């Protein structure tokens, strides 16, 4: 999962995905709030980005944009409605830009903003800010986390900024109480946010004061962290009561789902056809798993064999971390030495444990990219899913089994090389259009990471370890199951329990991980379907590129990844008009 420039705050863990902060005294590579030219589209883009950063200051911090580090977002109902009005006005302005007055690159920028604003418009009457507490809980936690992720400012300045943000936590949680409607809120999503709020109490009390190694600023930061922890504790009590009254639904329905696929992502099919594509892919990949299991184990009980492989898990979270570091290094060498992709300048990916507040809601590895607007290439961060504090021995064993030794190679490819880390580092180095460093589609970004898993298998990366190769197919099959479940949940064709059963019987997930996964699908409609859908679309574009003799495999990878993380339909248009 690319949680990253990266807009997961909109998911249930709410990992920010779009913005960031920069050391004010360092040389600024690019101020995205200033037009890159006097052309009308560049002025519109700069105004649009300034409004985006103003609406999501922690997102600005992630991206490396200076001037937003002391603030949290305004999430009151009037503020949300005011942004809706601004979005509609900007949508009309971008739609009014005619093709014949724009260059090819400008048309891509225009259409990228239009796709984003249309997606928001399609979900406006869903009133997510009245349904899901996650964004309110995540605002303060991610607000602090993003400040210290890349440490782009001196510790004393970061401590002061974090103190300001923590002081705003009670205000944000008060906005949640005013906005949340028990008739609209789903109990499942409330429970998910409650788990994060409780983790936030511990994060603020125990982790935040240790973020600053020097005494200067630590006292004020510690006091603000305790006050924020108290606010999260009170909000946890509120959510525990609110859950009992919540009676809303999480399913967005076929009309919204299809509109997002077609009008936002530029796909040619809607929710029903996507579900059937998922079923077909699931059947094909399950057959492959049976065949590979027969070759390795002499029987075709692939789920039983995968369970055996899961028993060969790292004995401790620290061993899991070491394994991910080893495979990340191997994947990097393979991708560069084989000439599959070009190396970005200053490339570095740090493999580190997940933060405590994230562990309660994410059981899988995830990634944050280097801030694209900061001075000089910084490291990306590949976060390893350590179990949360207080996890029972059984829960720790299950978390480790989900990260069995046979899975580490595929996950390292997906999250690091040449998956999320390489893509986002390459895009940051190659993309000169500011808006493409900010807006992206999960169908491309996650599609890319799954595409390269298969591409690396085709190139022989897993050949020396048939068990790891089987797990690559297993993890791809899991993404096919996601398509079936995500569409079925939001079309009202599956209950949550049905979905958990499906994922823990048709895919290889354990019941605990399956339940966590399904809760994520409920909170983030269409995202779970993006992985395999995007991967198949990118593979189709690759085959067309190579078939037309347009260049080498590396040329294709460098070209399409360098365009950004465009919606699939727009990526295809841009690829056809490139070079």
How would you name each of these model-derived features?
Residues 19-579:
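N-terminal maturation segment of proteins
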Residues 1-25:
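N-terminal amphipathic/basic-hydrophobic helices that include classical n-h-c signal peptides
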């Amino acid at each position: 999962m690319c949680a990253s420039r990266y807009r997961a705050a909109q998911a249930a863990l709410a990992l920010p995905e779009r913005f960031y902060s920069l050391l004010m005294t360092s040389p600024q590579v690019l101020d995205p709030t200033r037009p890159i030219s006097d052309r009308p589209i560049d002025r519109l883009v700069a105004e649009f980005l300034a409004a985006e950063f103003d609406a999501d200051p922690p997102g600005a911090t992630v991206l490396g944009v200076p001037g937003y580090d002391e603030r949290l977002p305004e999430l009151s109902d009037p503020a949300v409605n005011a942004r809706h009005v601004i979005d509609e006005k900007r949508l009309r302005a971008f739609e009014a830009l005619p093709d014949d007055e724009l260059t090819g690159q400008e048309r891509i920028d225009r259409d990228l903003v239009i796709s984003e604003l249309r997606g928001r418009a399609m979900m406006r009457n869903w009133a997510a800010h009245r349904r899901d507490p996650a964004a309110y809980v995540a605002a303060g936690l991610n607000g602090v986390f993003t400040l210290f992720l890349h440490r782009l400012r001196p510790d004393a300045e970061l401590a002061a900024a974090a103190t300001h943000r923590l002081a705003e936590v009670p205000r944000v949680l008060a906005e949640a109480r005013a906005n949340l409607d028990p008739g609209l809120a789903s109990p499942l999503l409330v429970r998910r946010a409650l788990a994060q709020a409780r983790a936030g109490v511990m994060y603020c009390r125990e982790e935040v004061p240790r973020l600053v190694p020097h005494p200067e600023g630590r006292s004020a930061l510690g006091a603000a962290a305790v006050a924020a922890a108290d606010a999260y504790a009170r909000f946890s009590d509120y959510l525990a009561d609110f859950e009992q009254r919540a009676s809303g639904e999480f399913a967005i329905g076929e009309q919204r789902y299809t509109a997002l696929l077609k009008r936002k992502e530029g796909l040619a099919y809607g929710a029903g056809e996507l579900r059937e594509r998922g079923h077909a892919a699931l059947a094909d990949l399950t057959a492959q798993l049976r065949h590979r299991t027969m070759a390795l184990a002499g029987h075709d009980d692939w789920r039983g064999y995968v369970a055996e492989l899961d028993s060969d898990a790292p004995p401790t979270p620290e061993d899991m971390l070491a394994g991910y570091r080893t495979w990340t290094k191997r994947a990097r060498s393979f991708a560069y030495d084989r000439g599959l992709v070009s190396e970005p300048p200053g490339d570095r990916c740090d493999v580190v444990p997940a933060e405590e507040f994230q562990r309660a809601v994410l059981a899988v590895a995830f990634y944050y990219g280097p801030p694209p607007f900061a001075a000089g290439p910084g490291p990306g961060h590949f976060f390893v899913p350590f179990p949360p504090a207080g996890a029972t021995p059984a829960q720790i064993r299950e978390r480790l089994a989900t990260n069995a030794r046979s899975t580490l190679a595929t996950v390292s490819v997906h999250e690091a090389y040449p998956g999320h880390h390489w893509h986002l580092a390459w895009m940051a180095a190659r993309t000169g259009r500011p808006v493409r460093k900010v807006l992206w589609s999960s169908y491309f970004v996650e599609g890319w990471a799954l595409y390269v898993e298969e591409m690396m298998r085709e190139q022989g990366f897993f050949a020396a370890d048939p068990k790891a190769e089987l797990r690559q197919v297993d993890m791809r099959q899991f993404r096919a199951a996601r398509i079936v479940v995500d569409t079925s949940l939001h079309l009202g064709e599956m209950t949550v329990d049905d979905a958990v059963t499906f994922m823990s019987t048709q895919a290889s997930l354990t019941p605990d991980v399956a339940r966590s996964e399904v809760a994520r699908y409920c909170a983030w409609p269409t995202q779970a379907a993006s992985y395999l859908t995007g991967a198949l679309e990118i593979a189709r574009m690759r085959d067309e590129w190579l078939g037309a003799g347009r260049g080498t495999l590396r040329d294709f990878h460098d070209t399409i990844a360098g365009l950004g993380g465009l919606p699939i339909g727009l990526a295809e248009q841009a690829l056809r008009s490139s070079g």
